Amino acid sequence: MSKSERRVFLLDFEKPLYELEEKINQIRELAEEKNVDVSEQLSQLESRAEQLRQEIFSNLNPSQRLQLARHPRRPSTLDYIQAIADDWFEMHGDRGGYDDPALVGGVARLGTRPVVIMGHQKGRDTKDNVARNFGMAAPNGYRKALRLMEHADRFGMPIITFIDTPGAWAGIDAEKLGQGEAIAVNLREMFRLDVPILCTVIGEGGSGGALGIGVGDRVLMLENAVYTVATPEACAAILWKDAKKSDKAAIALKITADDLAKLQIIDGIIPEPKGAAHANPLGAAAKLKEALLFHLNTLAQLTPQERKQLRYDKFRHLGQFLETAV
């Protein structure tokens, strides 16, 4: 991310760190221009910047993590695929006459393994987001995903899904094309597949849109991703008739990776680089690849029947909750 982009997309809680880093850069440039030794002062300021970065990113509240999950420069499905996989070949169409740019998928090689990778795809700018429907997949997107899953199962290739959507497309045309049925069929069929399935929430994990490619042997989350039954804004509008109470809803919904790990909804948290994934996309991709390879190696030791039974049991046992006052 360029310096100008960082300034444009700066989040409120990042401003103190940004201002300090700008001060460091200005002092460094001035010292070089005037040929003055300020190494000791720079060292002190850099130590302070590192301390401030640690303070900010180790004490994020749910709403702040939601902002990071929605950051316009957060790595997308295609960004991660290009960074971690080789021989990527995208496949299109649901074999019913439709394609969906909001959900991409294809075959690739992860390490030494051929795999099928799919995930929601948001845009980088307004035009791209409109073309990709802001990552909200239509029924044909979920049917395309199912076709790719069946392809993977037929050829014995593990399935990797990347979840990053505010929710499934809720337009009238989506209902006409059978949105609910498409997601429901995917849920049913993912329990039946013989091959290993790894699901990772890389940004927003929104409602049924996330679940449509979210049934796996392992469900992982990036450190600053969120996973929720409804957006905090929608929840606040429903419960309190006021979308401005979304901060309160974000706390009650338990949307963060830490909360969901405690509730055993997810199986693991993938740490992000300092400053979150958008600050260091390649560093985030390296940590993601490491986690995927580890879990693929673990799942490869099980028989298909063992994996399916564990997969079924995992989702049947979901349901822990914490009582809180809202």
Curated annotation (Swiss-Prot):
It catalyses: N(6)-carboxybiotinyl-L-lysyl-[protein] + acetyl-CoA = N(6)-biotinyl-L-lysyl-[protein] + malonyl-CoA. GO terms for cellular component: acetyl-CoA carboxylase complex. Its main location: cytoplasm. GO terms for molecular function: acetyl-CoA carboxylase activity; ATP binding; carboxyl- or carbamoyltransferase activity. Keywords: ATP-binding, Cytoplasm, Fatty acid biosynthesis, Fatty acid metabolism, Lipid biosynthesis, Lipid metabolism, Nucleotide-binding, Transferase. It is found in: Cytoplasm. InterPro entries: Acetyl_CoA_COase_a_su, ClpP/crotonase-like_dom_sf, COA_CT_C. Belongs to the AccA family. NCBIfam families: accA, AccA_sub, PRK05724.1. Acetyl-CoA carboxylase is a heterohexamer composed of biotin carboxyl carrier protein (AccB), biotin carboxylase (AccC) and two subunits each of ACCase subunit alpha (AccA) and ACCase subunit beta (AccD). This is Acetyl-coenzyme A carboxylase carboxyl transferase subunit alpha. It comes from Synechocystis sp. (strain ATCC 27184 / PCC 6803 / Kazusa). The gene is accA.
